[in-house]
Amino acid sequence: DVLGSRGLGDVYKRQPADVYPLSTFADIKAYCASRHMRLWQYAEECEGTEIWDYLKEVWRCMREAVTRGLETEGTLKGGLDVQRKAKMLYRQNHIDESAETRENRLVCAYAYAVSEENAAGGIIVTAPTCGSCGVLPSVLLYMQERRGFTDTEILHALAAGGIIGNLIKTNASISGAECGCQAEIGSACSMAAAALAELHGMELDQIEYAAEVAMEHHLGLTCDPVRGLVQIPCIERNAVAAMRAINALSLANFLTYTRKISFDVVVNTMYETCLLYTSPSPRDPK
């Protein structure tokens, strides 16, 4: 069934395959709480222990994308004359740089690195898409370097972030062409915030709050790449979303039990916003 059509083509009602037996965060949270499980344990229970070999490869590819991006200079192809900025950003440290400024600079440099690799046709991990591939690896690598988290802890965080991404894909969309950039960068930010919360050993309610905040403040964001290339504003948008994921983590740490909105509600709202975005406008030519 065609739900609507606007600029980027027809939008069809999706019927995604089930990955996990439970399809809402509320149900997963209740299931995990009743069994004293972490989200990564739920992923392992559903997918088997082989998930860890897969995620090891995912993490290796993510790290390598950051490394390549930080080492490469030049102009991205496509005609927009976009200069690669990750290396410059990474090296622009100052003697009087504050800890907060350094964190922002490094996280952004890592996000730029991966996003520029994507724009250049390099190997990246869709997390959840190519256009939003810089958010998750940038925050996880920064936290590993800063806090000394083990690779095993990173893999657990990736599993938690993957559950969030799957829930968004199941109940809404991760496609920018279908639902705007709220579905790409919003989903990536939500996955990253949840992964960070898992990495820091937060409770399920706190993980949910981090994911909810991260998605909520991307609602309505449009897919608007200049000349259709995943460069402007896409690369910069990855860096901004990475910082926002860290902000969502901080809020979840302090304000979880004051929240009024669930993650599931925000995901549904995102898809409702998508339908408004793709519905014919009264001003559209007949």
Regions found by a protein language model. Give the residues of each.
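Secondary-structure transition/capping motifs at alpha-helix termini
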Residues: R146-T152, L199-L204
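Single conserved hydrophobic/aromatic residue that forms the stacking wall/gate
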Residues: D1-Y12, Y277-K286
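Functionally critical mobile loop/hinge segments
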Residues: A194-S279, R283
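Catalytic cores of large soluble enzymes that bind and process phosphate-bearing ligands
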Residues: A17-Y20, Y31, C46-Y54, V58, ...
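Accessory "access/gating" subregions that flank catalytic or transport cores
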Residues: C61-C130, G134-M143, R147, E153-N166, ...
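Contiguous, well-ordered alpha-helical segments that form the cores/surfaces of helical PPI scaffolds
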Residues: A109-A113, G134-Q144, A159-L167, Q182-E198, ...
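Active-site nucleophile and cofactor-binding loops and adjacent substrate-binding regions
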Residues: V125-S132, G176-A188, C234-N238
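C-terminal regulatory domains involved in ligand/effector binding and gene-expression control
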Residues: S5-R6, D10-H94
